[in-house]
Design a protein with these regions (language model features):
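A short glycine-rich, Lys/Arg-flanked "PGG" loop and its adjoining helix->strand segment in the class I
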Residues: 119-133
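Conserved catalytic/acceptor-binding region of the Class I
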Residues: 139-229
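A short acidic, Gly/Pro-enriched loop at the edge of an enzyme's catalytic core
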Residues: 94-105
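A short SAM/SAH-binding and catalytic strip from SAM-dependent methyltransferases
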Residues: 105-118, 140
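Class I SAM-dependent methyltransferase Rossmann-like catalytic core
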Residues: 2-26
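Conserved alpha-helix/loop element of class I SAM-dependent methyltransferases that forms part
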Residues: 22-39
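Class I SAM-dependent methyltransferase SAM/SAH-binding core
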Residues: 44-46, 50-95
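Conserved Class I S-adenosyl-L-methionine
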Residues: 180-185, 200-289
Length: 290
């Protein structure tokens, strides 16, 4: 069983909560205007994680056949339990378990930077029909300003994170995290190099600002709690990334401190005391044709 990514790189809770926000129906038109997909298409998501994008695709294209693929068993199990009509399979992005020309669309989100380009693009081109569409979403440097009540860290917390920092970096390096990252010029050139034509580049800004009245109270709380989930999952991963480096008592104390801070942030939101903390995700979207 392969749980390496979900255990040591990005936990289920963090991945699912962040992707559900980014692929909320609130942003549907922004995505679909650039995707330009036909109803009834057979769509393969490579590196589907917990299935948040697959579920969004099924909502946005109800007659589509949506298939999600990931190498992490925990992600696939989670996605299968929550499927809304999609199919999920375990597999490798560089050895897709599908016949030539079997999909109309391939799509990936924050995957290309972790996979060797010739295999990544070559396999997608193989499983696409002639005229099929390859969509690639890649996170670019965005903006993040946490609320002051969340940003505060005690000396106790700073010492522990300094203690395990090298272990987290090593885990990322050992699993090839970001090993094949390409810049905004190199990505479209790579797509062309490996056989795609009519390559387009677009950029989407996803603004997650809880205090913006554009969002409902439920959405605002989800934004705050997604950041909480990320911080809590980082603590939970400590034991698998740096075994024995931090005692359970100290990990429990870290959890209490994180929850206290985010509880304060939620209380400020409920009281109408705006903090204007923001996470703005910038996504580069590429579209190419076989």
């Amino acid at each position: 069983m392969n749980h390496f990514w979900s255990d040591r790189i990005q936990s289920i809770g963090t991945l699912d909560s962040s992707r559900k926000l980014r692929f909320s129906d609130r942003f549907q038109n922004a995505y679909t205007e650039l995707f330009r997909l036909e109803e009834g298409a057979r769509i393969l998501e490579i590196g589907c994680g917990t299935g948040a994008l697959c579920r969004a695709l099924k909502r946005w294209y109800p007659s589509a056949e949506v298939v999600g693929l990931d190498r992490d068993d925990a992600f696939i199990d989670y996605a299968r339990e929550r499927n809304t009509g999609e199919t999920y399979r375990k597999g490798d992005a560089t050895a897709l378990p599908f016949a030539d020309g079997s999909f109309d669309v391939t799509i990936s989100n924050t995957v290309s930077e972790h996979v060797e380009p010739s295999g990544f693009f070559g396999e997608q081109r193989r499983v696409l029909r002639d005229g099929g569409v390859c969509l690639l979403l890649s996170a670019r440097r965005g903006i993040q300003h946490p609320a002051a009540c969340v940003r505060e860290e005690s000396a106790f917390e700073m010492e522990i994170w300094e203690r395990v920092d090298a272990d987290f970096r090593r885990a990322a390096k050992e699993n090839g995290v970001g090993a094949y990252a390409l810049n905004e010029m190199e990505l479209p050139a790579a797509m062309e190099k490996y056989g795609f034509r009519d390559v387009e580049t677009h950029y989407l800004a996803i603004n997650l600002t809880p205090d913006d009245p554009f969002y409902t109270p439920e959405e605002a709380r989800d934004m705050i709690n997604a950041n909480r989930q990320n911080d809590l999952d980082n603590i939970e991963r400590m034991e698998s990334v740096a075994p024995g480096a931090v005692s359970k008592a100290d990990r429990d104390r870290l959890v209490r401190l994180v929850n206290e801070r985010y509880d304060r942030r939620l209380a400020l939101y409920e009281a109408g005391e705006k903090q204007w903390d923001v996470t703005l995700g910038l996504t580069m979207l590429l579209r190419g044709v076989k």
